[in-house]
Amino acid sequence: MPPAPLENSPGASASDTIFALSSGAPPAGVAVVRISGPMAGVAIDRLTGSRPRPAARRASLRALTNPDGGALLDRALLLWLPGPGTATGEDMAELHLHGGRAVTAAVLAALGRLPGLRPATAGEFTRRAFETGRIDLNEAEALADLLAAETEAQRRNAMLLAGGALSRALEDWQHRVLSLAARLEAQLDFSDEEDVAPLDPGFAAELAALDAEVVRWRGRLPVERLRDGVRVVLAGPPNAGKSTLLNALAGREAAIVTPIAGTTRDLIEAPVALGGIPFLLTDTAGLHEGTGDAVEAIGIDRAGQAIAAADIVLWLGDPGCAPAGSVRIGAQADRRTHDSAAHDLLVSARSGTGMDDLVALLLDRAAGLLPGEGEAALSARQRAALDRLGEALALAREEGDPILVAEGLRLARAAIDALTGRAGTEDMLDGLFGRFCIGK
């Protein structure tokens, strides 16, 4: 059966040789063009004329010429990378060009005229790595997160998963589940249908140990807080200094500040990185009773919803009215007198008083909401599949009937396959690899 056409490129096939600019848009000091597929070696032969192909995995300076006429295109560093030990698992080549627009365009155009070559679609190099088994779905997702990472915490988490932290555990679990299933099948095969021997204690102990490891992974924190930021809501009555404090934390004028009460009527969000950790700061409408303004009433209602969904609430108001668990801030400390004993912090966004202490407090609170050193946060997809794996192992452990134990182990294998992407749907894969840029 021929390879299926690719979703984003009508008529294209997964057996084509693909190429793309994989470095930043020119002009630049160097432009890197990647080629992957069965014709990668032929492509560099055509661009370099009759010269012998470079030694594998050694950079070689070569003149690149247009196959149609022989005009010199550039003098470039060329890398020949025969598969399968490459990023995509296929034959690959890299051209390190002078990074001008005209040079890059000329080389890409020359490649496009070679038979069997076509431009890559978004994420196609990574998809080929997945389809050849060089990476699994978790590593592909982590690579997408790494490319999107804007903070140190996001980078660290992506690197843990891209480095195979979860994938290694899954490979081990799959081996152990298969081993247990094989032992069980052998016992069933060599037993009379009406006289199946009970499972031996060693079998149950191995199953329990596996379940305990899965339980630990199921307890990992969600990655969404790392991706979207720790939600910090600034709340309190009108004119309490919420917008001024948000602007100071964000380092920009994200919210309008005036002496007029009720200036902020809707939620104003400002993403910010503090100490390498992502936060999502939210300014809210001033809370008070008896407003006759319908628009302001909607803003107050939304403020209440934001407070309920917050990870951290900074309360700028009467300490006695502070929501449970909130940080009581005595704001505008350069102009107002506060009872320091009733507040957690006294700050002034204008003078900077207490701002370092506030940032330190936010980082301390965030540390309890984010994964610890060496622990990876997991996506909703990963957590759901781990839950299914845990349920399957629970079935296998609770049922004394070997037939039902075998069914639990079968469901466990299916859950592991879903985690690694062996049982992924095309729509889900298309959505993932569409997050990548062309050339990755």
UniProtKB/Swiss-Prot annotation:
K(+) binds at N239, T258, I260, T263. It is an enzyme of class 3 (hydrolase). GO terms for cellular component: cytoplasm. Its cofactor is K(+). One of its GO terms (biological process) is tRNA wobble uridine modification. Homodimer. Heterotetramer of two MnmE and two MnmG subunits. Exhibits a very high intrinsic GTPase hydrolysis rate. Involved in the addition of a carboxymethylaminomethyl (cmnm) group at the wobble position (U34) of certain tRNAs, forming tRNA-cmnm(5)s(2)U34. This is tRNA modification GTPase MnmE. It comes from Rhizorhabdus wittichii (strain DSM 6014 / CCUG 31198 / JCM 15750 / NBRC 105917 / EY 4224 / RW1).
